[in-house]
Amino acid sequence: MPEDRPIEDSPPIGEAQTDAPAGGCPAGFGRIKPPVAGGSNRDWWPNQLNLKILQKNPDVINPLDEDFDYRSAVQNLDVDALRADIVEVMHTSQDWWPADFGHYGPLFIRMAWHAAGTYRVSDGRGGAGAGMQRFAPLNSWPDNASLDKARRLLWPVKKKYGKNLSWADLIVYAGNVALEDMGFRTAGFAFGREDRWEPEEDVYWGPEQEWLDDKRYTGERDLENPLAAVQMGLIYVNPEGPNGNPDPQASAIDIRETFGRMAMNDVETAALIVGGHTFGKTHGNGDASLVGPEPEAAPLEEVGLGWRNPQGTGVGKDAITSGLEVTWTHTPTKWDNSFLEILYGNEWELTKSPAGANQWKPKDNGWANSVPLAHEDGKTHPSMLTSDLALRVDPIYEQITRRWLDHPEELAEEFAKAWFKLLHRDMGPVTRYLGPEVPKDTWLWQDNIPAGNDLSDDEVAKLKELIADSGLTVSQLVSTAWKAASTFRSSDLRGGANGGRIRLQPQLGWEANEPDELAQVVRKYEEIQKASGINVSFADLVVLGGNVGVEKAAKAAGFDVTVPFTPGRGDATQEETDVDSFAYLEPKADGFRNYLGKGSDLPAEFKLIDRANLLGLSAPEMTTLVGGLRVLDVNHGGTKHGVLTDKPGALTTDFFVNLLDMSTAWKPSPADDGTYIGTDRATGSPKWTGTRVDLVFASNSQLRALAEVYAEDDSKEKFVKDFVAAWTKVMDADRFDVA
């Protein structure tokens, strides 16, 4: 993170800096309308549901061959040769962007840090796992200024290894190699991140419309969820201090909040700051207001680069990235303990960078002429950021870092672990880690699951019979499997039924999981598990039970189906489960079961789309699951909202048929609780009740089109088939151990 303050006075997001006259439109500049007729639907109806997020990364935009499998290809990578090529790049300074101190390592560390550091634990979004730093908005965030050059420096490496090395892997591996080349011993590295080919449109980065604006706080300093940065376009905190106020203690509050929101504790936070700021420098040797537009707003001739600096050479000693001009240590390309030695070896006074940014220098000319200049002979004094001094003034951070001052080996160990966590937090379980540098050590945050057992066809058949005869209802079987599997997040590949954590805390006590009823079902499954004499995991039993429920429901609707089942799930223990970390997976809403928790900040139908998105579902898959789960009577609390059938427990198309029936008139409930009453249009007698999630399948034009398909007379068998396919997709979403 050696460069983490954005350029001030940036234009509004998406708007280029230009001298175009009012009303004029010089070619390639200004705010021009794309070649489409009129505004988009979103312009006309800004509150419209965005179903496009349910069709992310379609195959049609992927230029690679249909049968190409990156996770297989990357295992053929010559990692030693790749490492050597990255090292050569780091030591070969280019005139178009000269290396600070003759080494691009610190720049690559910052690139990797800022790629991974967008991760946030609340919804699992962000992170380095898909190479999103290449695309807007991240490629143009003020905090990512000059990282366009870092990626461009690595293009010859990417070009050489082609499709066998993703940008997502290369960006973070280059940072890892940089640390090791400068003398640090990392904990290892895992390959396996697959590139995507379009920006992520489903990530909420904040309400602001201008870079560095701050409209995300309420109260004294309450940061809006799920955000994990203090201003639009920053990765974490403003290194000058909150909103530029150079108050180290206030900065410590922001640091703890933002790093905590990306799953780092105090020790990990301190280690990342100290370790990252052991290397390199920041850039602010000039007037930051003169720097050109970011890559997405830059003219075509910049060929994807941005932030052109017209002052002096514009690069090297004249470079401007953050507006801060700080070199922390006298050995900026070597791992040592000098950052802490300098931080605690001086008293500090506030000063200004050449760009006018708040930073700190030693009092009384301390450590004068001890820090090298990056691009010319001579030396200067060290400098610090407000966020650096926070480590010294905050009592908790001070206790941690003062110990490291005397025990640098402990700092090295903690930084290695925290850096590995930073780069791999969004990769999912260790079964997804690939390559020769995967560490043997495992950590609690990886949500580790012991290997499960295979089951024979006869064993599966016996277990299904025991479940069917257990007295558990279709609703109990299906809802329990859904509660377990639907915790899965495609964003960071956490959650899911594997591990059997539905029987453990915190999931066993979640309000959304109806703890009293869930405890009864868990006990029944444990009885079956013991009585069967079969070495079956609790996790497998829950999914198999859900399948039994679906098969029963299909038979009640007149169809004999066998729901696909792949055994092999393992059972985690309570000791292998980080209760605090898993708490972030607790559903605040689950439209599939008509559950809406207290204090929801969005209408229920928007929450449904978000949950379907995290589950990796398409709009048709979401539609079939909602319609099917309604008639299977699995609503939270046993409510009858949306159970539009007189045959609950049968997998029929009744939800769609009755929802679209024009003999029913709907109106809001007098209770004003977000529910609706459906009455007979002729007699006025009540027929049904529903929620916003139910009625949206008749109200939204796209969802209605899907609902109509399943309401048609010839769709009964198709619906059962489609429901089973979507159900199986959710049940197996976390099965990274099988093809």
From Swiss-Prot:
Catalytic activity: H2O2 + AH2 = A + 2 H2O; 2 H2O2 = O2 + 2 H2O
The keyword Oxidoreductase appears for this protein: yes
Keyword Glycoprotein annotated: no
Record-marked site positions (Transition state stabilizer): R110
Single GO molecular function: catalase activity
GO biological process: cellular response to hydrogen peroxide; hydrogen peroxide catabolic process
Chain residue numbers at which the record places covalent cross-link Tryptophyl-tyrosyl-methioninium (Tyr-Met) (with W-113): Y236-M262
EC number: 1.11.1.21
SUPFAM superfamilies: Heme-dependent peroxidases
Assigned keywords, A-Z: Heme, Hydrogen peroxide, Iron, Metal-binding, Oxidoreductase, Peroxidase
Residues given in the record as heme b binding sites: H277
InterPro entries associated with the record: Catalase_peroxidase, Haem_peroxidase, Haem_peroxidase_sf, Peroxidases_AS, Peroxidases_heam-ligand_BS
Post-translational modification: Formation of the three residue Trp-Tyr-Met cross-link is important for the catalase, but not the peroxidase activity of the enzyme.
Names of required cofactors: heme b
Described function: Bifunctional enzyme with both catalase and broad-spectrum peroxidase activity. May play a role in the intracellular survival of mycobacteria.
Subunit organization: Homodimer or homotetramer.
UniProt xrefs under NCBIfam families: cat_per_HPI (TIGR00198), PRK15061.1 (NF011635)
Name of the featured protein: Catalase-peroxidase 1
